[in-house]
Amino acid sequence: MAMTAAVKDELSRVDVPKPCCRRAEMAALLRFAGGLHIVSGRVVVEAELDTGAVARRLRREIAEVYGYPSEIHVLASGGLRKGSHFIVRVVKDGEFLARQTGLLDVRGRPVRGLPPHVVAANVCCAVSAWRGAFMAHGSLTEPGRSSALEITCPGPESALALVGAARRIGIAAKNREVRGVDRVVVKDGDAIAALLTRIGAHASVLAWEERRVRREVRATANRLANFDDANLRRSARAAVAAAARVTRALEILADDAPHHLTSAGRLRLEHRQASLEELGALADPPLTKDAIAGRIRRLLALADKRARDLGIPDTEAAVTPDMLVV
């Protein structure tokens, strides 16, 4: 099951004992998923949802909290609609429900944001409003660089109200308009986990965090692999360059170099991929890595001085650009 569907399914089963929280959740659910229609002179309340469990929860809450009957109609998938959608419709008592849930104000005008009884309520109601908003029009992407919890809003007023509700429960959320659609977004991974926990999606938080950790481990492993590859390439280039310079040094000096320096140089040529520490261990008698490095360095310096005196190419000239392409 996709993350969004899993969260909505879990939220549809959250038990909310406090009446004020049930009203706040329902107000947000109807505000973010619903609309008011005038049919034959009567106000009809509708909410379109993409999860059957959420539609059944809304229908039950309307009956238990306000005592009004409602209908559920199923819209089969087709066209731009990827899956089945569910319409919860209140016809007979639509205007009463709209007034009681804050969709209409005392003068019968539509409320564009969240109703006052939600905006000015306790923190628990702010949490319930977020639960309702997510069940109505929320989405959660997989953890990663562009992970986000997002609510699609019916307008800028409701988006600002939802940002304010998030602030009251200690969550940083931002509202933005994308292609003419208002959205509220939470992008920080820790904030997403905290918000899901507050609204009651505990199992979904564990699954999301597990995927988040797995992705971070995979990204770290990839970075280390790339780092190791880069180190290997650098080491290979250094080995090729060192071998070329030592070969040229032995050509320049011929038999004039001290035996202990030429021995170190030949050891380098015989074991081109060995580290300095390994090279020192192969010497007879064994040398420290600093000692073997010092002997090779003196061999190259002696050869370069001889080359300058003779006016011939030195050891650096033996290193060609194509040798450094590994």
Curated annotation (Swiss-Prot):
Q: Offer one example of a GO biological process linked to this entry.
A: regulation of sporulation
- Gene3D superfamilies xref list: Homing endonucleases
GO terms, molecular function: DNA binding
Protein keywords: Cell cycle, Cell division, DNA-binding
**Pfam families attached to this UniProt entry:** HTH_WhiA, LAGLIDADG_WhiA, WhiA_N
Q: Does the keyword Endoplasmic reticulum apply?
A: no
DNA-binding interval(s): 275-308
What InterPro entries does the annotation carry? Homing_endonucl (IPR027434), Sporu_reg_WhiA_N_dom (IPR018478), Sporulation_regulator_WhiA (IPR003802), Sporulation_regulator_WhiA_C (IPR023054), WhiA_LAGLIDADG_dom (IPR039518)
Indicate yes or no for the key word Methyltransferase.
no
Source domain of life is: Bacteria
**Member of which family?**
Belongs to the WhiA family.
Stated role: Involved in cell division and chromosome segregation.
NCBIfam families, A to Z? DNA_bind_WhiA
Q: What is this protein called?
A: Probable cell division protein WhiA
